[in-house]
């Protein structure tokens, strides 16, 4: 499945289940957080965050994927903690996020930089799987692996990484 954001084709490649908790640990996601997943796919990241007590916002342009995310949240008993937004990630309002999760392409990350910098509050954490945000300094880098895959998480903090 594919979504188009601002005319850019972004394939849906789900984050491996065994990597999710490591991402949430890296950003210290918990109660009181509002986690936005930009291009949320089947909702697995916001669902895991909701199970930790965080509220989630699932931003997805593809209606089939958004429906699947809603169904998954209902079956996991956390739908009441997640807002589902069918929108382009470049247009969605993300200003109340305390954490943003992205598994996009580097080119898309770079196009999102102005939005992230202008809309997010100082201290907001950004987790990106496998693709850096060019020109920003990561606060932490975490290598993750499973028998089937190796990945890298980059953690950025608004007001620290984007200077």
Indicate where each model-derived feature is located.
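S-adenosyl-L-methionine
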Residues: 1-33
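Conserved class I S-adenosyl-L-methionine
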Residues: 32-41
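Conserved SAM-binding loop of SAM-dependent methyltransferases across substrates and taxa
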Residues: 42-54
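Conserved SAM-binding motif I beta-strand of class I
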Residues: 55-60
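Conserved SAM-binding loop
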Residues: 69-70
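Conserved SAM-binding strand-loop segment of SAM-dependent methyltransferases
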Residues: 77-89
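A short SAM/SAH-binding and catalytic strip from SAM-dependent methyltransferases
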Residues: 95-111
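C-terminal substrate-binding/active-site "lid" region of AdoMet-derived donor-dependent transferases
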Residues: 107-163
């Amino acid at each position: 499945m594919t979504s188009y954001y601002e005319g850019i084709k972004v394939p849906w490649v789900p984050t491996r289940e065994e990597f999710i908790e490591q991402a949430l640990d890296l950003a210290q996601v918990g109660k009181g957080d509002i986690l936005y997943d930009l291009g949320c796919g089947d909702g697995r990241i916001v669902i895991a965050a909701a199970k930790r007590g965080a509220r989630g916002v699932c931003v997805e342009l593809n209606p089939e994927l958004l429906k699947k995310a809603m169904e998954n949240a209902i079956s996991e008993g956390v739908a009441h903690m997640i807002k589902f937004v069918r929108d382009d990630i470049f247009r969605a309002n993300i200003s109340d996020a305390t954490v943003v999760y992205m598994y996009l392409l580097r080119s898309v990350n770079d196009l999102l930089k102005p939005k992230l910098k202008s809309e997010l509050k100082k201290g907001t954490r950004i987790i990106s799987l496998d693709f850096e945000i060019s020109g920003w300094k990561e606060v932490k880098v975490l290598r993750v692996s499973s028998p089937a895959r190796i990945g890298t998480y980059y953690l950025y903090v608004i007001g620290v990484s984007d200077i």
